[in-house]
């Protein structure tokens, strides 16, 4: 898991969020024999070409190849980048995250997960909950899961922050069975 804290705002550091995610994911994935490590900062300077000045956003797909190299460098099963910038993909105004199951990498943006983004007071607990949901969602894709029609399942597509707030941080029974099956395979 890679973090980025170079986005300057009055939102404060995301280190507590990264620590929370590392601890939670470490506990969740330990039962599948997967170790979760926080390996340091991801400099946005590597992604200057991904920035669209007209949109004031980064094209999310440009993070994935770099994460793939990091995954190889650490001989990891998967790599997750967490950034504090607004990201998008063509056809979408914004996205919370993007995964590439073939590369076994994903990126999640905290930018629109902050309650302050929506004019609400700061709430670190809510931010951590939202971040966990989006990270679990993208890692689900990394490990072979598609979107789920169950609005409470973490694999349900979030078209807005309301969708993220409605769903659970956990996989529904069907998605959890698929995840466990996929993680048991040696090639995943």
UniProtKB/Swiss-Prot annotation:
Is this entry keyworded Protease? yes
Which EC main class describes this enzyme?
hydrolase
Q: How is the cofactor bound?
A: Binds 2 Zn(2+) ions per subunit. One is catalytic, whereas the other seems to have a structural role.
Q: EC number(s)?
A: 3.4.-.-
Q: Which Gene3D superfamilies match?
A: Collagenase (Catalytic Domain)
Report residues binding Zn(2+) 2: 148, 153, 172, 175
Subunit note = Monomer.
Name of the molecule in the record: Archaemetzincin
Q: Which gene encodes it?
A: amzA
């Amino acid at each position: 898991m890679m973090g980025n804290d170079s986005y300057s705002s009055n939102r404060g550091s995301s280190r507590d969020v990264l620590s929370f995610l590392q601890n939670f994911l470490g506990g969740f994935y330990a039962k599948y024999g997967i170790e979760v490590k926080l390996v340091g900062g991801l400099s946005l300077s590597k992604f200057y070409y991904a920035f669209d000045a007209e949109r004031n956003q980064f094209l999310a797909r440009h993070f994935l190849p770099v994460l793939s190299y990091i995954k190889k460098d650490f001989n990891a099963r998967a790599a997750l980048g967490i950034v504090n910038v607004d990201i998008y993909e063509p056809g979408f105004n914004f996205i919370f995250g993007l995964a590439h199951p073939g590369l076994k990498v994903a990126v999640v943006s905290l930018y629109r997960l902050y309650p302050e983004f929506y004019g609400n007071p700061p709430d670190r607990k809510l931010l951590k909950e939202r971040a966990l949901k989006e990270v679990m969602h993208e890692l689900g894709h990394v490990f072979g899961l598609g979107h789920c029609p169950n609005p409470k399942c973490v694999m349900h597509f979030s078209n807005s922050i309301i969708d993220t707030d409605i769903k659970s941080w956990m996989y529904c029974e069907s998605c959890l069975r698929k995840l466990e099956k996929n993680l048991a395979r040696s090639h995943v």
